[in-house]
Amino acid sequence: MSEQGEVTLRAYGLVLAATVSYTSLTFIWFTLPAYLSVVIEEVGLTGTEAGILAGAVPLTYIPLALFTGVAVDRIGLDYSLAAGLLIFGLAQIGRSFATGFPSLLACTLLIGVGATVITFGLPKLVSILFPPAETGFPSSIYLVGAAAGTASAFAIGRPVIGPFLGGWRPLFLWSGVFAVGYAVVWFTTARVFSLEGTTPEHERSEDATLASNSISRDIRAILAHRELRLVVVVGTVYLLVIHGMQGWLPTILESRGMDPGPAGQATSLLIGANVVGILVVPTVADRLEARRAAVMTCGCVIFVGLAGVLAGGIGLLMAAGVVATGFGVGGLSPLIRAIPPELEGIGARLTGTAVGFVFAVGEIGGFLGPVLIGTLHDLTGSFAPGLLVLAGGAVVAVGAGYAMQDVSG
């Protein structure tokens, strides 16, 4: 094998190893929504408290995301990803022993702290291992891994693994133990594969000047960038919809008379369609050089899908709506990560900081999605008002896409 082939193989090996950390994170994250109806009954939660728990991980991104993005850019991915795994793994173990809303909330917020590191570390890893024109496929790998973790929480975590282990508490315990163990595996793998040895020349030259660039200058450049601010709007809608739907869809369907098993599997359908969107939309957008049009199209698809969920009961129309919604948000997911490195003044060097900014603001939507659905249900006795809020967000995404200048890889 040629030297270039060995470098490429090593780069993909690191991406695959890091992807396991994302899969573990999303499985742990969404074990609570998968078991939400059970936890509500057992712990005695109100709809508002359940919504806060479902939105607690996104809530941590608001104060921490920008700081974490800057830290990942400077600390190194071997230490930072291992620390993230350790934090959310220990928090999941703590969540298995929680006895009420305060302890559940504290542990879930701590999961969010570790989650920020993984969310911004993976785009950074891809940006240093691959040149900008070749980041699409490796980015899809870790996003599919993240979706697999989420889908597994609903498809096998609730109906299979949880009952086998004895309920939600043992499931939380052992998934946390796995994450803590994998922190050691990742750190060892990163050292053996040598992240520095896989860093391409276009990134090394920028790394050499990194120390001379102050954090404050980097942040000012991020905040002043018009196109990045529009990406933030799209990111906010993406997070509003995906966290709102993933956090509440099983409970919404159970309230319509669907059994817990099929309700969880319907949520897996959302994630499966999300994966298809992740794989298809950025590829088509880059081939047609039409990322702006892709953003607008995804917003329209999300709106139509949510209308189907609203009107479809538990029948085929609902299922089609779930698929459309999942496909639309799946398409937005890689776009909000792929656009920042291509923006003038951002590039690979500031990718972690830029994506951190997108999520720092965008996770306001990620927090409000689940909270509004739960609160509006408490106030009205219906999930329809919350779903209408998500549909309104899809319209906003269309407008933000229209205002963008197209950026294509």
Where would I find each of the regions flagged by the language model?
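Cytoplasmic membrane-interface "Motif A"-like loop-to-helix N-cap segments
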Residues: 74-84, 286-300
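Extracytoplasmic gate region of multi-pass secondary transporters
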Residues: 33, 225-268, 273-282
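Helix-breaking motifs and short loop linkers at transmembrane-helix boundaries and internal kinks
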Residues: 44, 76, 97-102, 131, ...
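Flexible cytoplasmic inter-helical loops of multi-pass small-molecule transporters
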Residues: 188-217
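A late C-terminal transmembrane helix in Major Facilitator Superfamily
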Residues: 345-382, 390
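Cytoplasmic helix-loop-helix junction between adjacent transmembrane helices
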Residues: 107-148
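Conserved MFS/SLC helix-loop-helix module at the cytosolic interface between two early adjacent transmembrane helices
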Residues: 63-100
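Helix-loop-helix hairpin linking two adjacent transmembrane segments in secondary transporters
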Residues: 133, 141-196
